[in-house]
UniProtKB/Swiss-Prot annotation:
Protein name as it appears in the record: Glutamate--tRNA ligase
Pfam family, one: tRNA-synt_1c
Gene designation: gltX
Main location: cytoplasm
Known partners and oligomeric status: Monomer.
Family: Belongs to the class-I aminoacyl-tRNA synthetase family. Glutamate--tRNA ligase type 1 subfamily.
Cellular localization per UniProt: Cytoplasm
EC class name: ligase
A GO CC annotation given for this chain: cytosol
Family annotation (InterPro entries): aa-tRNA-synth_I_cd-bd, aa-tRNA-synth_I_codon-bd_sub2, aa-tRNA-synth_I_CS, aa_tRNA-synth_I_cd-bd_sf, Glu-tRNA-ligase_bac/mito, Glu/Gln-tRNA-synth, Glu/Gln-tRNA-synth_Ib_cat-dom, GluQ/Sye
Cofactor detail note: Binds 1 zinc ion per subunit.
């Protein structure tokens, strides 16, 4: 990279951090860190009616949770602030006045009703993409002064140059061209005095010395408008990279109303997903490393990130893959951290009290350890461990079939006799008791283990049996064995 790399992620506080925004932030971050550059988080809060309370804090908090430790923002001044657009209105005003003075922009007094009428007339004439006619472009200074004196509200529009081709040399899509004739004179300042996105973003990116802009492909159509502003001021635009859409499993564009996918980072956090797994997963949404490996640490991703490997085709948000990936991380997780992740869900579900005794806390820790291999996310411990919290065992159909086999009464009777004598009631002692049953009954393998598992858990698959039996407790195991011996299957 010839110049200093400075990138930006510019969320609006109109909601919480969405998976699309998280992916954009992540690619900006990986690129900046790969080249030893800086990442700016700028808050684009000019759509005041749509801003939600706590939206700003939520965006920043979730970025930090993911491991995106940006360099500059509203909470980290890097000398390029303010980092909130509503605090930059005077800056925009200065540049708007410059364009007005140079004749590159003009005041437009057309009412919303007039503009709608224009659009309808153009549609009726078969024009698919209506544009502003530009009639206020030709007002004389006297006419403008008179309309202003009458207190008529106005917007400010940019004069679109005629007969120009705008070319974007995009890092993802290659060369993309736009014709100025397809773009009508567009509004740079709304009637309320607030600049529009396509104007403010150019001023900000230039003054903050942004070198590269990674953003979603829905912004591609904004690029020619932004290039016009760069051109009028004689500024060099940044290098653009428009990332492909994220689609759902039906290959449809992800919409915030799509209920088949959890869409906000905070929801994954609440469910007990790990930030390092989410970071890894988002990095593979529209970018692929060389080779087959899919599990990478943050530092590895920073080292191998290569813009040339950004995908040109839509990337599918595969929830099964995310769950699989999170499970890979959980398997390797330090038990203390896993307990921190999963235990609150058992409390929230009412399975355990909030103020646990040391004994209860140790039992919960052992329970969570028992399911470490199977658990895909923290909250899943509640459904996985259900059998430990039921008074009565519930038999699955497969368990009933196992318990109907002819050798079962012998196996269960022998095991029950051993369990009654067991002291201490530990996994090692339980393992020895199962071995003793093997000896006395001659049954082994599935014929031995399956009936015991089915009788005490109601299931045919599950965590390591001696440990599960230990955690169920001696009394509960005796009751369940007795019931299985008396019940008809």
């Amino acid at each position: 990279m010839a110049k200093n790399v400075r990138v930006r992620y510019a969320p609006s506080p109109t909601g919480h951090l969405h998976i699309g925004g998280a992916r954009t932030a992540l690619f900006n971050y990986l690129f900046a860190r790969h080249y030893g550059g800086k990442m700016v988080v700028r808050i684009e809060d000019t759509d005041i009616e749509r801003n939600v309370e706590g939206g700003e804090e939520s965006q920043l908090e979730n970025l930090k949770w993911l491991g995106i430790d940006y360099d500059e923002s509203i909470d980290k001044d890097g000398g390029y602030g303010p980092y909130r657009q509503t605090e930059r209105l005077d800056i925009y005003r200065k540049y708007v006045n410059e364009l007005l003075e140079q004749g590159h922009a003009y005041k437009c007094f057309c009412t919303p009703e007039e503009l709608e009428r224009e659009r309808e007339e153009q549609r009726a004439a078969g024009i698919a993409a209506p544009q502003y006619s530009g009639k206020c472009r030709h007002l004389t200074p006297e006419q403008v002064a008179e309309l202003e004196a009458q207190g008529k509200p106005y917007t400010i529009r940019l004069k679109v140059p005629e007969g120009k081709t705008y070319e974007v040399d995009d890092l993802v899509r290659g060369k993309v061209t736009f014709e100025s004739k397809d773009i009508g004179d567009w509004v740079i300042v709304k009637a309320n005095g607030i600049p529009t996105y396509n104007f403010a973003v150019v001023i900000d990116d230039h003054l903050m010395e942004i070198s590269h802009v990674f953003r979603g492909e829905e912004h591609l159509s904004n690029t020619p408008k932004q290039l016009m502003v760069y051109e009028y001021f004689g500024w060099e635009p940044p290098q653009f990279a428009h990332m492909t859409l994220i689609v759902n499993e039906q290959r449809k564009k992800l919409s915030k109303r799509d209920e088949s996918i959890i869409q906000f980072v905070s929801q994954y956090k609440e469910l007990g997903y790990l930030p390092e797994a989410m970071f890894n997963f988002f990095a593979l949404l529209g970018w692929s490393p060389e080779g087959e490996e899919e599990i990478f640490t943050k530092d590895e991703l920073i080292r191998i990130f290569d813009v040339a490997r950004l995908s040109k085709s839509p990337s599918m948000f595969d929830t099964k893959k995310l769950t699989w990936m999170n499970n890979q991380y959980i398997k390797k997780l330090d038990l203390d951290r896993l307990v921190e992740l999963a235990l609150p869900h058992l409390v929230k579900a009412g399975r355990l009290p909030a103020d646990m005794s040391d004994e209860q806390r140790q039992w919960a820790r052992d329970l969570i350890a028992l399911y470490q291999e199977q658990m895909s996310y923290g909250a899943e411990i509640v459904s996985l461990s259900e059998l430990f919290f039921k008074e009565e065992v519930e038999y699955e159909d497969e368990a009933r079939q196992v318990l109907a086999e002819e050798q079962v009464p012998d196996v269960l009777s022998a095991f029950l006799a051993n369990v009654r004598e067991l002291e201490p009631f530990t996994a090692d002692e339980i393992k020895a008791a199962i071995k003793a049953v093997q000896k006395s009954t001659g049954q082994k393998g599935k014929k031995l283990f399956m009936p015991i598992r089915a009788a005490v858990t109601g299931q045919t698959h599950g965590p390591e049996l001696p440990f599960a039996i230990q955690l169920l407790g001696k009394q509960k195991v005796i009751e369940r064995l007795e019931r299985a011996l008396h019940e008809k299957f």
